[in-house]
């Protein structure tokens, strides 16, 4: 049976919950068109997160890996285009580490592009009435760290496996502590992630439509 690995993070930065894990854990053992979804939680810690991710990939042997993370302040489901080879932490991770201008992989390439049909995924999610867009940066914190490490592994050892990263907004119960910050319901995020998986599994060549940004 084909399997999809989807990951979410533990809470960080003083939050009580992390929306990525709150939604992703609901998808564990879900069957979609003959494909089994396996959900795993990652620690919000440099190095440790990649160790946990690599262990999960070894265990699950997936055809698709989707890593999900919180992007407080963003209003859309944002599907990441690129990961860069740098850790530059504005705040410490959950183990107190705060790397500055450190490469994720020594001698690794400057960046990796996603292995997902991101524009087709954005279009499909929007057609379901859920705000979505292509993101040009995954940041320089643990989310980018995981995305880069994932793509490095897939490019080096699992070239047939699709993979990438999706950022999601706060849940409403978080946004009440961040006045003015946008949020999205867990149900909407769940629908968006199910669509993302379905489209990623079906589409081999992405749509040739705009998804860029002017800044």
Swiss-Prot record:
UniProt GO MF annotations: pyroglutamyl-peptidase activity
Keyword terms of this UniProt record: Cytoplasm, Hydrolase, Protease, Thiol protease
Where is it found, in Gene Ontology cellular component terms? Answer: cytosol
One Pfam family, short name please? Peptidase_C15
Q: Where in the cell is it found?
A: Cytoplasm
Reaction catalysis annotation: Release of an N-terminal pyroglutamyl group from a polypeptide, the second amino acid generally not being Pro
Q: Which CDD domains match?
A: Peptidase_C15
Query: Which PROSITE patterns would you find in this protein's record?
Result: PYRASE_CYS, PYRASE_GLU
- For this protein, the Enzyme Commission number is 3.4.19.3
Major subcellular location class: cytoplasm
The answer to whether keyword Transport applies is no
Locate the active site: 80, 143, 167
Q: Which biological process terms from the Gene Ontology are attached to this UniProt entry?
A: proteolysis
Q: Which domain of life is it from?
A: Bacteria
Enzyme superclass (EC): hydrolase
What HAMAP family is this protein classified in? Answer: Pyrrolid_peptidase
Which NCBIfam families does the record associate with it?
A: PRK13197.1 (NF009676), pyro_pdase (TIGR00504)
Oligomeric state and interaction partners are given as: Homotetramer.
Function according to Swiss-Prot or TrEMBL: Removes 5-oxoproline from various penultimate amino acid residues except L-proline.
Family per UniProt? Answer: Belongs to the peptidase C15 family.
Protein name, as recorded:
Pyrrolidone-carboxylate peptidase
Organism of derivation: Yersinia pestis
Q: What is the lineage of its organism?
A: Bacteria, Pseudomonadati, Pseudomonadota, Gammaproteobacteria, Enterobacterales
């Amino acid at each position: 049976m084909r399997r999809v690995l989807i990951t979410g993070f533990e809470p960080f930065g003083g939050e009580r919950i992390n929306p990525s894990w709150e939604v992703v854990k609901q998808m564990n053992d879900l069957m979609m068109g003959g494909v089994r979804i396996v959900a795993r939680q990652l620690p919000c810690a440099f190095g440790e997160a990649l160790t946990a991710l690599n262990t999960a990939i070894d265990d699950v042997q997936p055809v698709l890996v989707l890593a999900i993370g919180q992007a407080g302040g963003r209003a859309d489901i944002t599907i990441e285009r690129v990961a860069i080879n740098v850790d530059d932490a504005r705040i410490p991770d959950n183990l107190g580490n705060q790397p500055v201008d450190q490469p994720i992989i020594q001698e690794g390439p400057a960046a990796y592009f996603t292995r997902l049909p991101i524009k087709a995924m954005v279009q499909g999610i929007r057609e379901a009435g859920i705000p979505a867009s292509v993101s040009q940066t995954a940041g320089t914190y643990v989310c980018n760290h995981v995305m880069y490490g994932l793509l490095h592994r897939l490019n080096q050892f699992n070239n047939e496996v699709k993979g990438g990263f999706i950022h999601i907004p706060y849940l409403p119960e978080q946004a009440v502590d961040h006045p003015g910050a946008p949020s999205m319901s867990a149900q909407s995020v769940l629908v968006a992630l199910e669509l993302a998986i379905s489209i990623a599994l079906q589409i081999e060549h992405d749509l040739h439509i705009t998804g860029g940004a002017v800044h």
